Amino acid sequence: MLTADIRRIAPQTPAAPAPDRAPEWVAAGTPEPLRAGLIEALGKDRVLTRALDLVKYASDASPYRLIPRAVAMPHDTDDVVKLVRWASRTRTPLVFRAGGTSLNGQSQTDSVLVDVRQHWQRVRVLDGGARVRAQPGMLLGHVNRLLARYGRKLGPDPASSDIACVGGVIANNSGGMRCGTWADPYSTVSSMTLVLASGAVIDTAAPDAEERFASAAPELANGLERIRDELRADRELSERVASKFKIKNTMGYRLCAFLDADRPLEIFRRLVVGSEGTLAFVAEAVLDTVPFGRHASVALVPFEDIDAAADAVAPLVAAGASATELMVAPTLIAAAHNMPGTPERWKTLRPESAAVLVEFRADDPDSLDAPEQAALEILAGRAVIDEPRFTRDRDEIEMLWHVREGMHGLLAAVRPSGAALIVEDVCVRPERVAEAAKDLQAVLGKHGFLPGLAGHASAGNLHFMLMLDFGKPEDLERYDALIHDLADMIVGKYDGSLKAEHGTGMNMAPFVEREWGPKATELMWQIKQLADPEGILGPGIVLNREPGVHLRNLKSTPEIEEVATKCIECGFCEPVCPSRNVTTTPRQRIAVRREMARQPPDSPVRQALLEQYEYEAIQTCAADGSCAAACPVAIDTGKLVKALRVRQHRAPATRAGALAANHFGALERVARAALRLGGGLAARASRRALPAAAPSQLPFTVREGAAAVYLPACLNRIFGNGRDSAVHPTVPEALVAVSRRAGRPVWIPSDVAGHCCGTPWSSKGYTTGQQLMAGRVASALHRWSDGGRLPVVIDASSCAYGLLDEVGADGIEVLDSIAWVHDHLLDHLEVRHRLGTVVVHPNCSGTHLGLSSKLAAIAARLADEVEIPAATGCCGMAGDRGWLHPELPASALRNVARELDGRSFDACVSSNRTCELALEQVTGRRYSSFVIALEEATRD
């Protein structure tokens, strides 16, 4: 009776089943003999075949949706070799996917999808940061955090850097806001380890690589030499190719490789960049890095019109601007109405005006003075609306870049129900960007679309977005008409690129010949045939002779729960989700939910998804809200999951939750006794190492003269500080001591036992129990604080966040221990025992409270060096969920453990006991509260 009832979480029945719903065969999973063949080739643990597996991989950031028949999960290069050889024998197409942020359908298939993210996350910094060696599943943002200490970064910097993976960036030849053609993957990839369609493995950096390539793939090598000679002999075509690639261009294959390299393998290595996984698999790449100044100065300069804005770009670039981003007035006006913090005056901008976001970067602040002054002189006398003002304030800079990078989320927030977003990008020669922008606005207006544009002005690269409901035939016709007019304008008038940075994909494959002409396109078809004679690598993704393929397999977006219905499936949530390498991500939880909503109530697919959703989506969700911070429209998928947990509880479970709330004081005593008497048994039962019990008595304090009320979290009232409590103080002992030492003593009420923030109930969906506890704690806080006269300090960030989020604590100041120490104690304490290096883990709740920088500042007072691992994120513990599902923290923290491996530190600190326990278990290092480290460092 206490088990979940999955029938209670079935979505609302649609008025009519969606035309693009998953077919009934999906209910049984991967069909035979495909399933058996894949398992034989790779092994059962490397193949996903259930209904939920297929549906969760059907969606990516593009407007397309194809349901794969199976998902392969290779762990290493040997697995990929086995996979491509099996695919070649069976003529089974493969499509590789890393981050799933591609926008044009290039990571979509109805055959076998190959996940090269989950087990492909190794990276190594080389030559003092001058180069990096990375696997395809490594996040760009993670690599850049590792490089930051060297003042370097990867060249490509797409807006999706925090979720885009190295493999996808190379596959699409992605660019970005500060990335010209000189810094894109084509220019910065120095070597690769490739798996050819035959299964041959070639390291292009090996001394004998050319010879091995010629031996392993003689027809390919000879064919590339033939095409090289043919292209070079055709002066008109070779000049056109050279000209086309002077600007950003990701349409088709990079024929410039035949002009830039002489030998077959070097030509092929260059062709693989931007080939979208259709010529070979990149198992590893070495990339050159570029310098990146640690300090920035930014201004958003509004101009009277687009011409004036564009005219200022070249001089600003000559003055050293690292970025010059063009935004037209409709974009800024929409931002002003929908983005908090944007200037009020943007709402009244004239429609014909435009703005340029200008950024300068330098290694030290003084070096920004000269370019700032040069920029002001350049802008003086031009048709600017407001006097230009540069800022170096991090918060202001973040807001300005948020406007530029937040276009995706901005339109998602106002997206009509059922509409999808399509992101387009084109490129023209930079000197014609103003003219092209006006023409593009006219084309958009002609077809009834918002004429909002933004782009990398110095590169002539313009981006725009479309909102369409593909369930409406008129929207499909409108989109098709727009694309054809766009092609006529960009290619016919400007000889530009129909895709500058986003890759070709099924969205633009039908238009490759329109841009390149029959002769160049035929050479591309020859390249594909030479590299992939069996046609197993992403067929139809870059080259496709089927007209209208860009109008097929467009996904519907059925309404689901309000908290998640605005999701555009961009995937920005995925890197911060602790279950991303175990079960599902927030994007996938929502995508599967939408598939349920597409199905009729008696559908076997719906039933299969409901049954599998319980563990895959509900039980293994940490519900910590990290996804909301990363999401462009602030969707907290944890709230969706918690709402589903409430719905699936039967009455006996709800009563049990209320009973626990009413007798929580007794439960505390039982828990401590269990830890003292049966810690070993409990650890074995939970498959986790448990700490010692906390002392039965809390430290002695008095109310008189207290500067704050101290509510020790139930975590710290139950769990002690590990098995070395005799050596180190407990958290309550340490906080009482440092508060007294700083002249700000705290008082612990004698009746704190039995009081809790309520998070254990709300996170599990026990609403009645949470309400009971919330009422009790709110009353106690009011009484203890003398009606709000004294602040209340709590020593676990999740509990502080819970009190503020769940209880509300109206009129009472609730302070996390980080804020208490940083704002009230730190300046009154003397560090007498300084540490060398301290590792800091900012946990989810502290991050939500905006306290991560304060935690780092406290650590900086204690130590010569503070390190926050580049892989830091949610630990996956989520209260007790990590004990119930130890696979969560084990997976969430694996990259942190790798980063710390083999190094020594004086202390590892955080601000939440269960997070510290998870970190200890996975990394093998002792983690404790920062308060303990502070107390020990400030002792006499």
Where are these regions (language model features)?
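C-terminal substrate-recognition/cap domain of FAD-linked oxidoreductases
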Residues: L48-Y57, A257-L265, R269-A481, M489, ...
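Non-heme iron-sulfur electron-transfer modules
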Residues: L543, V549, R580-E616, A634-L659, ...
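Iron-sulfur cluster-binding electron-transfer modules in prokaryotic oxidoreductases
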Residues: D532, T637-D940
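Ferredoxin-like iron-sulfur electron-transfer modules
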Residues: V512-R514, V549-E569, P600-A623
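N-terminal glycine-rich flavin-associated loop
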Residues: L38, S62-L94, V112, V116-A159, ...
